[in-house]
Amino acid sequence: MFLFAVLALATAACSRQAPAPAPAAAPDTQTSADNGPDFGAVSVDIAPPKKKAVDIGKTTEWPEAKLESGKASISCSTDYVANGDGQAFTNLGFFSLLDVMLPCKEVGVVRLRYKGRVAGDLTTLIERVASMATRMGIKQRILDIDSSGGQVEDAIRAGDVMADTNWTMWVREGAVCHSACVLLLAGGDDRVISGAVGVHRIIRIQSEATSRAQLSAELHEVHDAMKDYLERNGASVAVADFMMTVPNQSLRILTPDELQAFGLIGRNAAQQDLERIRLVRRCGLDFVRREDAFHRAFEQQCAQPGQAVDAINACGLALRPHYGFPDKKCLDDGPLAELDAQAKAAAEAAEDNGDADLPIATQ
């Protein structure tokens, strides 16, 4: 009974919203779709994945795999302006990833930069980086993506992997997340978006339909799968319906208000509900109230359309002290904790040297 009362107080605190900022000028939301080989958002007949004979979390003998649908690199820094995007790699074997990610173990953060199509090897990439991060105790994981789309079924699988392994997702300035990539946003615990996010209708490249009715029947199953996926991951099922209204040759860029309404930006609602109970127990009601207040201010003051991701992060870091963060009691659970990893490593090193002052992350 005490816990339910505590949660009720926390929910009531969240309902008191600060005044919304003045609306920004309406952006140009209509453009042409990428005419690449995947047509942006493709549905194909893919055999269900076989039950895995190897649990990659319990062995070093991973099945051979190579990244072919895009370019990936690993960085142990969130400051991409100063430090770039890290070390590139294509081999997804155990020891290859071990070598690339080992420097991130001490820092406690891994940023996976990916530029390319949404395909089956992207799912493998995310799954294996997450598995290696778990082995190394790296809790802060960022998928820094730039993708014009790919296969819907693979996007759903990759998004579910992300949801199970706690990723923050970035769409940086100059990057895009179009078509099937948009589904990945639902899988992130938190989404920081500066680049363009766009949707359009799914195309069945293996379709034998000769009428709109036949094509509609073929798309119905994948449309329902998209809705189920969006619902279980805290996004609005209206995203799937909206996609079907935009011709495949066109691209509808989502506005910040639409991203918010569809549950594709900021904190993931489903993950937030899941974490709230744990946070109240572990960090206390005051912590949860301060975190909620911070995120309301962050969304209004920092996450503005057109801002670069590094500027959004810098704004959030400057805002945190006003709400008592970082909180020494729950360093790994506070807002923008992924940006604290390097500062935390420095703090632990300082403590070993007899200086216990806690540095605050800055950019």
Predicted segments with their positions:
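Bacterial N-terminal signal peptides
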Residues: 2-11
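Bacterial signal peptide processing site
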Residues: 14-17
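Small-residue-centered hinge/linker elements
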Residues: 19-20, 27-139, 148-150, 194-237, ...
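Extracytoplasmic/secreted envelope proteins and their assembly/folding machinery
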Residues: 123-130, 155-159, 163, 181-182, ...
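Surface-exposed patches in mature extracellular/periplasmic domains of secreted proteins
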Residues: 139-145, 170-174, 194-197, 236-246, ...
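Glycine-rich beta-to-alpha active-site loop
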Residues: 151-154, 161-206
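Charged, glycine-interspersed solvent-exposed loop segments at helix/strand-loop junctions
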Residues: 206-293, 297, 301
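Low-complexity, Gly/Ser/Thr/Pro-rich intrinsically disordered linker/tail segments
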Residues: 272-363
